[in-house]
Every structure is written in C-alpha cells, then in structure tokens.
C-alpha cells in the first residue's frame, strides 16, 4: 500500500475557504447577514441532483442550522462567528470559522482542480454534505460538473448501531 500523495488539513486552508466565499458573494450565490455568510440554495437550479431531493421537500433544521439570519430555511452556512472557546480566523465578515461543507470544496479545488473524476464517502454524506459541496463548488468555479462519479459506502453495524469514531 502506498502512502497518500497529500494529507490536507482544513485548518491550513482557511484562506482558500475565505476566497471561495468571497467569490460566491461576488457572483450572487451567497449573502452576509449579522457576520454570517449563507449560500442561497434557490439560486442554484440543480440543487438536489445527487440526493434526488426536491427543494420544496427540504425541512428546516434537518442537519442544518435553523437561524433568523437566513433568507430561506434551506440556505446553508458558509461562515459563522465562533463561540468563545471555538477556533476562529479573521475574515472580511469578522472573526469566525467556515461552515462544514466548505473545507472539502476548497481543498479538492486546490489538490484536484475545479472538476475531478471520483468523489466518495459514506451514504450519510449524500445529503446535505455532498449536495452542498456540489452547489458551492459549481457556483464558485463556473463548472457544469464537480465530480464525474460518486461512490457511497454503507456502514458497518454492530447490534444495529453504526460503527464510527463519532460513536466512541
């Protein structure tokens, strides 16, 4: 087995995430409100293409943060202020941190380009994580495709419980 070519860390690429957010704002796909920046899902007509979810079927709060700062309940966070004990970085929107989905888009662009062949992950990442990656990456990079092929694996379970680091 060979060692990986790259082992990027999200915390070392926050500058690229800030650049991507700025590009999305400039192109009209994102907006700032009270030091938060959100991706406006309704602006991306193909949202839901991977998960086969219709925009009107999305329920506010389903693994997404419900906030009065959003224009629409389905909009997802690109940048938010950090809480007192959380890591934070300086940005045009104040001290804060990037949203969960942005790190993958920024690092894949740096190491794989605007479009690449294969993207994978667990089936639990199809929505919202991979769906949001597609939206923000395609809109920021002006591409018709983010990844050509998607591979999603099921889980290993023990006593009907998902086996994962997050489970302990």
Where do the PLM segments sit?
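Alpha-helical recognition segments enriched in aromatics with Gly/Pro capping
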Residues: 15-168
